[in-house]
Amino acid sequence: MSFRLDAASVSYANGQRALSQITLAASRGEPIAVIGPSGAGKTSLLRLLATSLRPSEGRVEVLEQSPWAVSAARLQQLRCRIGMVHQAPPMPPRQRVVTAILAGRLGIWPAWKSLLSLVYPADIDGAGEQLARLELADRLFDRCDQLSGGQLQRVGVARVLYQRPELILADEPVSAMDPVLANLTLGELRREADTRAVPLVASLHAVDLALRWFPRIVGLKAGEIAFDLPAERVTDALLRELYASESASPPVQGSQALTSIAAGASAAIGGDTQPRPACR
């Protein structure tokens, strides 16, 4: 297993419980989408898998290691094997895009190479290749504060693609993108995960994107798993129940009606990592 959570819970110092009794596992190369209303615990779940949150109860294993039972040095080594795409990528505003992407390997390269790359980028071609996959190659030498929110998100994805981690986690990676770029970006994440047989876990606001690109859907509600099902078994009724606390229908990226979301899930995945023309 690439990761396993057994009855894992997370409680904060103020007593608020973010996750409750989460049992979840993924095998090598398995893509999983996590959906649910705001405050359901999606980000907390990803942070738990990234080993940036420690469980208050239960057991966590990531890449065949127990993060909280190893030394600080081994924990740092484990974290270098995990790639995290943030909704708002943590990049210094004045940092160049090329440097931001190469930072994906700072924990892997020798210290001297990491330090030198901050001044003289060590692999300009490699960074450019990842940007080109996301149609952003022309911004390689721009500063991060010159980019839009969606462009910054693509830089964050490019950094993880360049890192080549053994576990890819993505927290709302396309929330600032239009439907065309969102599909392009998720397609590249899927392609990377499929090609290298590494697990990909992404939290997504848009239900239609989750069903389009991921064969397994985990629904979170109030910090608990509401369902864990193949995409083709996620029905409109399940989605309405999951989002019952929100005033609107389950959120979608485009104009697709809720009644057509689950019906098209099986055809959208089927091993093909190209989006259907209707969404482009």
Swiss-Prot record:
Keywords assigned: ATP-binding, Cell inner membrane, Cell membrane, Membrane, Nucleotide-binding, Phosphonate transport, Translocase, Transport
GO function term, MF aspect, one: ATP hydrolysis activity
Membrane topology classification: Peripheral membrane protein
Residues that, per the record, bind ATP: 36-43
InterPro entries: AAA+_ATPase (IPR003593), ABC_transporter-like_ATP-bd (IPR003439), ABC_transporter-like_CS (IPR017871), MetN_ABC_transporter-like (IPR050086), P-loop_NTPase (IPR027417)
One GO cellular component term noted in the UniProt record for this chain: plasma membrane
Cell inner membrane in keyword set: yes
UniProt domain ABC transporter: residue ranges: 3-247
Pfam families: ABC_tran
Keyword flag Translocase: yes
Main location as per UniProt: membrane
Enzyme Commission numbers on file: 7.3.2.2
Catalytically driven reaction(s): phosphonate(out) + ATP + H2O = phosphonate(in) + ADP + phosphate + H(+)
Protein location: Cell inner membrane
Subunit structure: The complex is composed of two ATP-binding proteins (PhnC), two transmembrane proteins (PhnE) and a solute-binding protein (PhnD).
Reported function: Part of the ABC transporter complex PhnCDE involved in phosphonates import. Responsible for energy coupling to the transport system.
Protein family (similarity comment): Belongs to the ABC transporter superfamily. Phosphonates importer (TC 3.A.1.9.1) family.
Protein name: Phosphonates import ATP-binding protein PhnC 1
Organism: Cupriavidus necator (strain ATCC 17699 / DSM 428 / KCTC 22496 / NCIMB 10442 / H16 / Stanier 337)
